[in-house]
């Protein structure tokens, strides 16, 4: 199509070619142990949790965000219930 305006003689339609049909489904199967290994290799669900507590020296509010799994969050909670305390930047 060269020129100022396209004309019908410039357009060629090829109607006798049929597109090839391709199966997009994968028929590959994994061993069950291989699937379990892949599942175990994925990282545990990590989420951000906000922690709000008070400074052990002056009583100011201390806020922080931790990223961990639920099991680690429970351990952190147990530490706060025992002896772990936070100090604010002013008292540090």
UniProtKB/Swiss-Prot annotation:
Gene Ontology biological process terms in this record: DNA-templated transcription; symbiont-mediated perturbation of host cell cycle G1/S transition checkpoint; symbiont-mediated suppression of host innate immune response; symbiont-mediated suppression of host type I interferon-mediated signaling pathway
Subcellular location: Host cytoplasm; Host nucleus
Stretches for region E7 terminal domain: 1-43
Disulfide cysteine pairs (residue numbers): none
Keywords on record: Activator, DNA-binding, Early protein, G1/S host cell cycle checkpoint dysregulation by virus, Host cytoplasm, Host nucleus, Host-virus interaction, Inhibition of host innate immune response by virus, Inhibition of host interferon signaling pathway by virus, Interferon antiviral system evasion, Metal-binding, Modulation of host cell cycle by virus, Oncogene, Transcription, Transcription regulation, Viral immunoevasion, Zinc, Zinc-finger
Residue ranges annotated as motif Nuclear export signal: 73-81
Domain of life per record: Viruses
Zinc finger map (unnamed): 55-91
GO molecular function, one term: protein domain specific binding
UniProt main location, coarse: host cell
Record note on modification: Highly phosphorylated.
A Pfam family annotated for this UniProt entry: E7
GO (cellular component) term, any one: host cell cytoplasm
Motif LXCXE motif: where in chain: 24-28
Similarity remark: Belongs to the papillomaviridae E7 protein family.
HAMAP family: PPV_E7
Biological function: Plays a role in viral genome replication by driving entry of quiescent cells into the cell cycle. Stimulation of progression from G1 to S phase allows the virus to efficiently use the cellular DNA replicating machinery to achieve viral genome replication. E7 protein has both transforming and trans-activating activities. Induces the disassembly of the E2F1 transcription factor from RB1, with subsequent transcriptional activation of E2F1-regulated S-phase genes. Interferes with host histone deacetylation mediated by HDAC1 and HDAC2, leading to transcription activation.
Subunit structure: Homodimer. Homooligomer. Interacts with host RB1; this interaction induces dissociation of RB1-E2F1 complex thereby disrupting RB1 activity. Interacts with host EP300; this interaction represses EP300 transcriptional activity. Interacts with protein E2; this interaction inhibits E7 oncogenic activity. Interacts with host TMEM173/STING; this interaction impairs the ability of TMEM173/STING to sense cytosolic DNA and promote the production of type I interferon (IFN-alpha and IFN-beta).
Protein name from the UniProt record: Protein E7
